Swiss-Prot record:
Binding site for nicotinamide: F36, I108, D109
Recorded GO MF terms: histone deacetylase activity, NAD-dependent; NAD+ binding; zinc ion binding
Name under which the protein is recorded: NAD-dependent protein deacetylase
Cofactor note: Binds 1 zinc ion per subunit.
Binding site for Zn(2+): C132, C135, C152, C155
InterPro entries linked: DHS-like_NAD/FAD-binding_dom, NAD-dep_sirtuin_deacylases, Sirtuin, Sirtuin_cat_small_dom_sf, Sirtuin_class_U, Ssirtuin_cat_dom
Pfam families: SIR2
GO CC terms, sorted: cytoplasm
Purpose of the protein: NAD-dependent protein deacetylase which modulates the activities of several enzymes which are inactive in their acetylated form.
Enzyme class: transferase
Amino acid sequence: MKKPDIQQLKDIVNNSNQIVFFTGAGVSVASGIPDFRSMGGLYDEISKDGQSPEYLLSIDHLHDNKESFINFYHERLLIADKKPNIVHQWIAQLENQQKSLGVITQNIDGLHEDAGSHNIDELHGTLNRFYCINCYEEYSKSYFMTHHLKYCEKCGNVIRPDIVLYGEMLNQKTVFKALDKIQHADTLIVLGSSLVVQPAAGFVSEFKGDNLVIINRDATPYDHTASLVIHDDMTSVIEEIVNSNS
């Protein structure tokens, strides 16, 4: 990576006080969670089984066959042993230093929360929470995993993860909170997102602040509008920033 890019990123962060982070699947790769659509990712593995990923991750699957849906997310979605990496930790640290308004994420792995971030807008929900589809009793991930739950202890109906399935709308309260963050940000740092899947592109379009920074392995449609673009291994970039500040 180019040292001038690292220095420019440091300068932008040091001179900003209302940073908003927008994160995609690339942020969690170093935690052992492959991008859903990459080789070896969830979509790739499901497709090998001859199943449609979109159907298995849909509200229709839940309605059509509750037992199949339960077994699917127990076998494929639950990620008990994954830990936050240096990128999650850096984001949380800047929030704790009151340099950041928070993080908007497309990820469902809950690793921003695990790293210590508090002001998180999880656009697609989180696997850190579960609830009953009938009585809406809520269960934490730790309780859910420890007790190997499949059915609600209160009413006996199915428990589902608090994620947005295909066929469901995004939570509008979460969307409005995310948009408000971006509209008040002086710097928007995009990490590990291709910015091609909606609503990601729409959110970036709402940013009117001073610095748009994009750190992603591949090019995005917004690279030409950014103050700084780094196409490199994200973990290496953030390690360089953290080590230079220590």
